[in-house]
Amino acid sequence: STEIWVLRTLNTIYVSADTGKATVLVSLDFSAAFDTIDHSILLKRVQMMFGVTGTALKWLQSYLLNRQQSVRSGHAMSSPTSCATGVPQGSVLGPILFSCYTSPISKIASAFGTDLQQYADDTQIYIALSSADMTSQLQALENCLASLNVWFSQNGLSLNGDKSEAILFGTQQRLRTLPNLDGIRIADSSICLSDSITTLGLTVDRNLTFNRHVANVVKSMHYHTRALRYIRPALTDEMAQSVAVALVQSRLDYANSLLFNTSVSNTRKLQSMQNQLARTVLWRSVDQSSTQLLKQLHWLPVICRMKYKIGLITHNVLNTGQPAYLRSLLTHYQPTRTLRSADQHLLTVPNLKTEFARRAFSFVSPTTWNDIPLEIRQLSSVNTFKSQLKTHYFSLI
């Protein structure tokens, strides 16, 4: 999921910051990425690199080749034209095929000592900067981007340097000690460093406060809550709750595991909006207890929702081993002597020095998991775990 994808990137940034490093990240933008994929290269790549053969390969060929498209304007329609390149956008296969097509770029990135994260055409390159080697590390990043640009050109993709973004992450103290960077060179362009970037619907600032993201979520929730208030008299309680969950609560829950340990101010803003939403759904006045309204709707408060999401992700990672990267961050606690805690299904909490780094998944996950009662932690059934974990957090309200 997009949330897991961002969790991985931010975990690396947080842990690097704990060792006194800043991280520079470049978010790449492609021009018409899905429309320029070469069919012959794609088919060869899925066959040679991913083992797609036989009937599956023939099906994929029929899906890609001899596809036609027309343009309608009013009552007029153009003649059908064959699509020599590209994969259909908005399809389930589109992002998967794009990822298969660009899979070789991970080796290019690793050859220069940089990290690469890719979710369909959302591609990010980043590298941790140490004071002693900053110049050589920035040069390695630019060399990597130059090599990637050559690869993109050879494979029919066009990198848009003007729309690509760069940002430098780190603690406020660390960023203040760094020299000013002129920018990152890419595709004959120089990208100036931004204070924040938006990726996959998440606005991320250089200090990872998520203030701008929370402000955007609050603004969106306020707009939709007000719209719901106008039509509330025409809805039943059940209909109002369904609309609220689909249009408003979903915005509160999106990537909320990343907001754990955000500022008290941000948490209060989100909680205030959830309280307003609950009053709108149940048609109650402001003097009603918001806690009781949330219980009546069976909605967990904001902080509990964050813990609940982290618990679900951790349970899934421990029981399935996937995604492998997150699984590698979690270690079962093994006491040096035979103690009762040896069979408590506990996780080892890493020793991170800074509060900034303690927002990393590798720290937040085990601390949240270890606080869950043993009888819930040891459940293997996903549905039973979800139900009992939610009941547990409700008992704490």
Identify what each model region corresponds to.
Residues 1-397:
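Hydrophobic/basic alpha-helical segments
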